[in-house]
């Protein structure tokens, strides 16, 4: 496969774990007893690679270990995919930057979330805005409509009608017509996402969210990712999270993490085997800088961002 050849040619120590290409055409039709009958078709193209290399560090956490990473591109249309050269370069760099990781010291520092990690955070956040969690009293955002729950610069919405985006749809899984919905406006929670059942429980109308989000959009800011990193004298660039320490009922947030340490505004050594911790409430208020470059490979459309203080538990 050409992508595999391009990637392995960049660094002799790399070995391919998987390279793939897929294309898909799907058709959705919904009919119900209320007389609704409609449908639509959509396409999806995806190409990617994951690679592995041995970590030859003689000291530190990675001694004798293998490091793996990769990159992929997904889009509704084939001509919107990233070039194979770009995918190969990112897969190579993302893997090599993990070599020789150390464990950071325990501290409180700013954390820059890569777009992928921003997406993970917003996915958890959005579940707290779903009506089924709210009426079951399993959301830290219960009874918070109209209140300031986040930094006033945050604008978050669900946008089902965006052209070419992966979460776009004309109706939800109950046949309710999809319309744009503002969730957070100037930091205030203004809507929940409701199915018909959840809406009835909360004495509200369905917002067309049976089946979950469509395209969840965090409005971009003005900073490049490099500028976000430059804004931090001593902190973390977060590239990976693991574990299940997320509680949308209480708002507690604790995840295993990997990343790169930021020193004097520049990426320094890789770090791993530590946890980051805070609460959703604090993180939303402390999310103070938002990037400009949106990752469109997922229905959660978000740029990277900075949270100005989180706890790091390391050595």
Segments from the language model and where they lie:
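Active-site bordering "gate/hinge" segments
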Residues: 1-169, 176, 185-188, 266, ...
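Dual-mode signal for accessory low-complexity, basic/Gly-rich regions
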Residues: 128-129, 142-315
């Amino acid at each position: 496969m050409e992508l595999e050849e391009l990637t392995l040619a960049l660094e002799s120590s790399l070995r391919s774990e998987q390279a793939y290409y897929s294309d898909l055409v799907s058709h959705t039709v919904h009919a119900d007893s209320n007389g609704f009958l409609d449908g639509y078709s959509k396409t999806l193209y995806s190409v990617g690679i994951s690679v592995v290399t041995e970590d030859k560090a003689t000291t530190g956490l990675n001694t004798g270990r293998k490091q793996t990473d990769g990159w992929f591109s997904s889009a509704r249309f084939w001509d919107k995919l990233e070039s194979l050269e770009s995918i190969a370069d990112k897969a190579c760099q993302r893997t090599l930057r993990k070599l020789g990781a150390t464990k950071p010291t325990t501290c409180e520092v700013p954390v820059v979330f890569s777009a992928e990690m921003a997406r993970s955070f917003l996915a958890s956040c959005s579940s707290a805005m779903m009506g089924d969690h709210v009426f079951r009293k399993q959301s830290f955002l219960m009874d918070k409509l109209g209140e300031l729950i986040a930094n006033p610069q945050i604008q978050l919405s669900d946008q089902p009608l965006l052209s070419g985006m992966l979460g776009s749809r004309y109706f939800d899984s109950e046949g309710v017509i999809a319309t744009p919905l503002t969730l957070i406006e100037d930091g205030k929670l203004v809507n929940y996402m409701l199915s018909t059942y959840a809406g009835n429980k909360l004495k509200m109308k369905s917002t067309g969210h049976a089946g979950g989000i469509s395209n969840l959009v965090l409005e971009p800011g003005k900073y490049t990712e490099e500028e976000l990193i430059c804004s931090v004298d001593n902190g973390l660039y977060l590239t990976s999270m693991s574990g299940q320490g997320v509680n949308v009922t209480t708002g507690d947030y604790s995840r295993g993490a990997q990343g790169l340490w930021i020193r004097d505004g520049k990426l320094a050594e890789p770090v791993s085997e530590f946890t980051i911790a805070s609460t959703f409430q604090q993180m939303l208020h402390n999310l103070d800088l938002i990037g400009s470059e949106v990752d469109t490979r997922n229905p959660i459309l978000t740029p990277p961002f900075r949270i100005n203080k989180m706890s790091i538990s390391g050595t």
